[in-house]
A protein has these predicted regions:
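Repeated loop/turn-to-beta-strand initiation elements of outer-membrane beta-barrel proteins
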Residues: 1-5, 95
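Extracytoplasmic gating/loop element in the C-terminal half of outer-membrane beta-barrel translocons
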Residues: 10-103, 108-109
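Short helix/loop capping segments that flank catalytic or ligand/cofactor-binding pockets
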Residues: 4-5, 13-15, 115
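Transmembrane beta-barrel domains of outer membrane proteins
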Residues: 6, 88-92, 151-153
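Membrane-embedded beta-strand positions of outer-membrane beta-barrel proteins
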Residues: 5, 104-106, 150
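C-terminal beta-signal and terminal closure region of outer-membrane beta-barrel proteins
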Residues: 31, 38-50, 65-67, 114-154
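Short, glycine-/Ser/Thr-/acidic-enriched flexible segments
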Residues: 8-10, 111-113, 153
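Hydrophobic, lipid-facing positions within transmembrane beta-strands of outer-membrane proteins
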Residues: 1, 82-87, 144-148
């Protein structure tokens, strides 16, 4: 049996989570639901609705974009990823009649990500941004892929 794994980490990077910024303004970002309900009630005249909403939630979840704080949405893009893992097993000859050798293999890519980044993936970058700045704006993370193979020699 053989096992091969490739991991990768990044530390010290930052990324603008424009998805969170945009979705908060649209009212479809779940962590803002409670704060936005209170902000809407206050705008309709119920000032007591703001009792449980702190200043951070007001800046992060404001419905009007000009009132939202962009700096809240710049997040650490530190991560550890298991880029690939492959496992191969040489099947004993007693199980493979007529074959000289048989190897069964499994491989996977992008199997695991450990990050505190709240967006889809800490490595995504909008194609419209330069190489000097990055933002996550409705991009797809890398696909998780799997491979299974059987190799037989006669």
């Amino acid at each position: 049996m053989s096992i091969e794994a490739i991991g990768e980490f990044q530390r010290g990077g930052h990324l603008l989570n424009a998805n969170g910024f945009q979705n908060a303004g649209l009212g479809i970002w779940q962590p803002c639901f409670t704060a936005q309900r209170a902000l809407r009630a206050a705008a309709a005249g119920d000032a007591s609705a703001l009792a449980g909403v702190n200043a951070g939630d007001r800046a992060r979840c404001a419905i009007v974009a000009a009132q939202r704080d962009y700096s809240y949405w710049v997040e650490s893009s530190d991560f550890f990823k298991l880029r690939s893992l492959s496992v191969s097993y040489d099947v004993p000859k007693r199980f493979t009649r007529g074959a000289r050798n048989t190897t069964v293999s499994f491989a996977g890519r992008n199997l695991f990500v450990n990050t505190k980044y709240s967006g889809s993936d800490p490595e995504v970058a909008d194609q419209r941004t330069s190489t000097f700045s990055r933002r996550d704006y409705y991009n797809f993370p890398p696909y998780r892929t799997f491979l299974f193979s059987v190799r037989t020699g006669f």
